[in-house]
């Protein structure tokens, strides 16, 4: 993943002082304040990072003798820098403009305070550069829990999502789920062209937002649980106690997975609601229902 400098300019309303190479891409989510570099120290310098000059760096340059400043700026901008942003609306020194034009480096300006600008850019890049993947399935928010419904085509994922929406829960995406990893969590969202849309066999595509209101759709949701649908098989030994701990790896993060056998007569929407509430209960409770039953059996045995 990469972010173009032009996109950064548009998203942060940056003023362009010097236009640089249009093919340059931002590929790391860190920034650098070049105080050490302007002092002549280049060990561990990362020119691929966005360079931000704030009041401290600007004042340091301002106090330099002109010839020294020219040499320092010339060396600094001789590196293959992605782009340079000057904060607080400060005026760049002439040496920066001259050397940036010579080396085809973007020089931008922001009115924001340096620390706030760094914080915003870091969070922005962490989001835009996060590892991504796309999975086939339906993502819904059930009782505040993000549940990814998977299974073969035609097994009833979208129909179940529709029933959940009717029961007051919310849709994030149907059919294609875009997933990105952010700080150890998985965030699911919808491709732009299918936001708020749900495909139901026999009816076609329905606009969930128009039929059920704006509150029935979410832009994104953290994925906490996977419900995998499969056709009921009589010879399968399905989990009946909730002790089978299955996980699915997505972008290196394990997500709890429950296999739900599907056959006529089973109310799958109600089962998913129960799974969501039970998942929340498991996070809050130190004892599982199986443990409670075992304790009761022990108590009965002791009484006998």
Swiss-Prot record:
Describe its function. Catalyzes the ATP- as well as the pyrophosphate-dependent phosphorylation of a specific serine residue in HPr, a phosphocarrier protein of the phosphoenolpyruvate-dependent sugar phosphotransferase system (PTS). HprK/P also catalyzes the pyrophosphate-producing, inorganic phosphate-dependent dephosphorylation (phosphorolysis) of seryl-phosphorylated HPr (P-Ser-HPr).
Q: What does the entry's free-text domain comment contain?
A: The Walker A ATP-binding motif also binds Pi and PPi.
Q: What else is known?
A: Both phosphorylation and phosphorolysis are carried out by the same active site and suggest a common mechanism for both reactions.
Residues holding Mg(2+): 158, 199
Q: Member of which family?
A: Belongs to the HPrK/P family.
The protein in question is named HPr kinase/phosphorylase
Q: Answer yes or no on keyword Signal.
A: no
Q: Which cofactors, if any, are listed as required?
A: Mg(2+)
Where does the chain bind ATP? Answer: 151-158
Does Kinase count among this protein's keywords? yes
Q: What is its EC number?
A: 2.7.11.-, 2.7.4.-
Q: How does it assemble?
A: Homohexamer.
Catalysed reactions, semicolon-separated: [HPr protein]-L-serine + ATP = [HPr protein]-O-phospho-L-serine + ADP + H(+); [HPr protein]-O-phospho-L-serine + phosphate + H(+) = [HPr protein]-L-serine + diphosphate
Class of this enzyme? transferase
Q: Which terms under GO biological process does the entry name? A: regulation of carbohydrate metabolic process
Which organism is the protein's source?
Answer: Clostridium botulinum (strain Alaska E43 / Type E3)
Report residue spans for region: Important for the catalytic mechanism of dephosphorylation: 261-266
Q: Which InterPro entries match?
A: HPr(Ser)_kin/Pase (IPR003755), Hpr_kin/Pase_C (IPR011104), Hpr_kin/Pase_Hpr_N (IPR011126), P-loop_NTPase (IPR027417), Ser_kin/Pase_Hpr-like_N_sf (IPR028979)
């Amino acid at each position: 993943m990469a972010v173009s400098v032009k996109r950064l300019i548009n998203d942060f309303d940056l003023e362009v002082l010097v236009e640089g190479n249009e093919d340059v891409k931002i590929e790391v989510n860190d920034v650098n304040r070049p105080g050490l570099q302007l002092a002549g120290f280049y060990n561990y310098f990362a020119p691929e990072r966005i360079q931000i000059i704030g009041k401290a760096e600007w004042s340091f340059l301002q106090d330099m003798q002109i010839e020294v400043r020219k040499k320092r700026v010339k060396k600094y901008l001789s590196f293959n820098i992605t782009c340079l942003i000057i904060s607080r609306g400060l005026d760049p020194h002439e040496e920066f403009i001259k050397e940036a034009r010579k080396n085809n480096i973007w020089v931008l300006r922001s009115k924001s305070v340096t620390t706030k600008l760094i914080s915003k850019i870091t969070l922005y890049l962490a989001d835009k550069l996060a590892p991504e993947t796309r999975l086939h399935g339906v993502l819904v928010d059930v009782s505040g829990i993000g549940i990814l419904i998977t299974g073969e085509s035609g097994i009833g994922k979208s129909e179940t999502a529709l029933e959940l929406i009717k029961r007051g829960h919310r849709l994030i995406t149907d059919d294609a789920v875009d997933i990105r990893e952010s700080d150890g969590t998985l965030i699911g969202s919808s491709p732009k062209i299918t936001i708020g849309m749900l495909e139901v066999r026999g009816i076609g595509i329905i606009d969930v937002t128009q039929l059920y209101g704006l509150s029935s759709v979410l832009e994104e949701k953290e994925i906490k649980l996977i419900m995998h649908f499969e056709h009921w098989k009589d010879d399968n030994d399905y989990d009946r106690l909730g002790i089978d701990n299955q996980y699915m790896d997505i972008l290196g993060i394990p997500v709890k997975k429950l296999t739900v056998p599907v056959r006529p007569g089973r109310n799958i929407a109600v089962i998913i609601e129960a799974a969501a509430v039970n998942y929340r209960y498991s996070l809050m409770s130190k004892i599982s229902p199986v443990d409670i039953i075992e304790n009761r059996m022990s108590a009965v045995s002791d009484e006998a």
